[in-house]
């Protein structure tokens, strides 16, 4: 018996999206970003499905170790880098590469003797102003890494775009100009483009692209759809109706009597709530798909349940499926209705939601 609620993950869609990104960046290798539990799609499941990716990007060392333990032998890169000096020996032992973005990491690399050098990606802050060395710091930082026997050569080079998901924003081109000027003539691989860079800034694709959300069939642009770019949604978040009740005009529903019916109708209770990661702040009218039609959320989302207005002529039954987002109800549309981004919806699902690979 299949569990509810569950996130149904499509192998076909994941593989299609990776192939599509290869088409969009034919001269680049693809570092598939699978941090945050594969954007909620299952870390190991996604990595094993995308076994023809050229490498995988993670945020935390624990994520990388989970992939190694699961048998993944591909290139792994810690996008946040290492946090503690003891992490360096673990990186060497498990052949994990690291971003270097801060003075404290330089100091740790200079105060340890590793059994073999670690592969480093030096991060330039070209305008994001979150992680990375400023243009003024770059030359001295690069020379320190070059002089360090704990650092494998050549040193690879990277930056991250702040506004690539705004295709008309000129700051992305300026960030690329800053980066290209700094690293001109240096050896090593380059990577600039995230999902938005890969989709909208072909000139930024370089040696590697680092797609995250696009791998899962979702557009990185608010109000846009992945399908417009040839991507396929990889997740269907589904649950079921556990109760249907007749509801009279003037009756309220849910905590705080937040919603009151204007006319007679039928309400359906769906077994999913904020305890599963569905947003409590989903407003009235947020769409849910039941038996092929869109029905609106009414009342407040509670911990384990939410309520939808099925309509007066509903023929739905207890046990029928309710789709919170997926192929027929894009997560981008749900996110826009709620006032958030699709990234947040897919990554905030809790362990109560079973992740099922088809």
UniProtKB/Swiss-Prot annotation:
SUPFAM superfamilies: Alanine racemase C-terminal domain-like (SSF50621), PLP-binding barrel (SSF51419). Coiled coil: none annotated. Keywords: Isomerase, Pyridoxal phosphate. Substrate binds at residues 130, 303. InterPro entries: Ala_racemase, Ala_racemase/Decarboxylase_C, Ala_racemase_C, Ala_racemase_N, Ala_racemase_pyridoxalP-BS, PLP-binding_barrel. PROSITE patterns: ALANINE_RACEMASE. One of its GO terms (molecular function) is alanine racemase activity. Its cofactor is pyridoxal 5'-phosphate. One of its GO terms (cellular component) is cytosol. It is an enzyme of class 5 (isomerase). Belongs to the alanine racemase family. NCBIfam families: alr (TIGR00492). This is Alanine racemase.
């Amino acid at each position: 018996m299949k569990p509810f609620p569950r996130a149904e993950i499509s192998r076909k869609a994941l593989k299609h999206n990776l192939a599509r990104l290869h088409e969009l960046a034919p001269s680049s290798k693809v570092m598939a970003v699978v941090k945050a539990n594969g954007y909620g799609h299952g870390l190991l499941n996604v990595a094993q499905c995308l076994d023809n990716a050229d490498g995988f990007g993670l945020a935390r060392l624990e994520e990388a170790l989970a992939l190694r333990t699961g048998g993944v032998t591909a290139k792994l890169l810690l996008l946040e880098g290492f946090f503690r000096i003891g992490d360096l020996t673990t990186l060497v032992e498990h052949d994990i590469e690291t971003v270097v973005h801060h003075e404290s990491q330089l100091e740790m690399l200079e105060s340890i003797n590793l059994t073999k050098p670690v592969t480093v990606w030096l991060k330039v802050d070209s305008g994001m102003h979150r992680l990375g060395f400023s243009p003024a710091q770059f030359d001295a930082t690069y020379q320190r890494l070059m002089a360090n026997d704990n650092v494998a050569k050549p040193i690879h080079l990277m930056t991250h775009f702040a506004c690539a998901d705004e295709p008309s924003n000129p700051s992305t081109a300026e960030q690329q100009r800053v980066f290209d000027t700094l690293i001109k003539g240096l050896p090593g691989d380059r990577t600039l483009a995230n999902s938005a860079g890969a989709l909208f800034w072909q000139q930024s694709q370089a040696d590697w692209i680092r797609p995250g959300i696009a791998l899962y069939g979702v557009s990185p642009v608010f109000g846009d759809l992945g399908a417009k770019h040839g991507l396929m949604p990889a997740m269907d978040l589904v649950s079921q109706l556990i109760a249907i009740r007749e509801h009279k005009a003037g009756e309220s529903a849910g905590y705080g009597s937040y919603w009151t019916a204007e006319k007679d109708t039928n309400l359906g209770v769906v077994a999913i709530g904020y305890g599963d990661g569905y947003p409590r702040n989903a407003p009235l009218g947020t769409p849910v798909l039941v038996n092929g039609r869109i029905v609106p959320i009414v009342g407040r989302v509670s911990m384990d349940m939410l309520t939808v207005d099925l309509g007066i002529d509903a023929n739905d039954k207890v046990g029928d499926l309710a789709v919170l987002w997926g192929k027929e109800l894009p997560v981008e549309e749900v996110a826009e209705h709620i006032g958030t981004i699709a990234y947040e919806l897919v990554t905030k699902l809790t362990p109560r939601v079973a992740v099922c690979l088809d």
